[in-house]
Design a protein with these regions (language model features):
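Short, small-residue-biased leader/transition segments that mark boundaries at the very start
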Residues: 1-7
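Short, flexible, mixed-charge glycine/proline-rich loop motifs
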Residues: 14-20
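Short "domain-exit" segments at the C-terminal end of structured domains
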Residues: 9-12
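Short cysteine-rich clusters marking metal-coordination/redox-active sites
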Residues: 25
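Active-site neighborhoods and metal-handling regions in enzymes and metal-associated proteins
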Residues: 20-21, 29-191
Length: 192
């Protein structure tokens, strides 16, 4: 892995060095390189020369791409908000999947999970000790005392929004409530 990173990084350095000041920029903006990303790439090259790992150009987004990702995230949040009142005792995870697929399409999105590497459903729903990527089923009925994770990814205008939400079904044990609370606190620490 370390060798692959070195090879990848050296290729990136070569790519940056091969772009002329008046060539079109690598980002696809149509602008000349010197007016677009040249100063940015020079800073990146400086970091690379000092031994830092630097991101591939594909990881660097334009303002338009960032806005597209933001809009996809908003649509994905709409889906999670929509499904919230349906997550209750007696409902099957298969029904939640159907509702999510219908609503995602209704708001102009595409359920990204559906068909991804053969995944058969539009959302991942994990109950209790299923860590992630639980497959919804009409035979899986929500019961009081369970905790549930709905992991949803929405494609909107070619961009992906991805998030999950935890739910407590009915009367949940103190241990499970603590797990959900502490997990949320940990996630919030990432954004402070």
């Amino acid at each position: 892995r370390q060798r692959q990173m070195c090879i990848r990084d050296s290729r990136k350095k070569d790519l940056i060095m091969k772009i002329g000041r008046n060539d079109k920029c690598w980002c696809g903006s149509g602008k000349k390189y010197k007016a677009c990303h040249m100063s940015f790439d020079n800073r990146i090259k400086d970091y690379w020369n000092r031994g830092y790992e630097v991101p591939d150009h594909s990881m660097i987004k334009t303002p338009e791409q960032i806005e597209g990702i933001r809009e996809a995230g908003k649509k994905n949040t709409m889906v999670l908000d929509f499904i919230t009142p349906y997550v209750k005792e007696g409902v099957s995870t298969g029904e939640l999947n159907r509702l999510i697929e219908e609503y995602t399409r209704e708001i102009g999105g595409i359920p990204a999970c559906l068909g991804y590497q053969g995944y058969p459903k539009s959302v991942c729903i994990s109950i209790d000790d299923v860590v992630c990527h639980g497959i919804p089923s009409d035979h899986q009925i929500l019961k009081s005392g369970q905790i549930l994770n709905v992991d949803c990814t929405t494609i909107y205008n070619g961009y992906f929004g991805d998030a999950s939400r935890m739910f407590c079904i009915g009367d949940v044990s103190e241990e499970k409530k603590k797990l959900v609370r502490v997990t949320k606190e940990c996630v919030c620490l990432l954004y402070t």
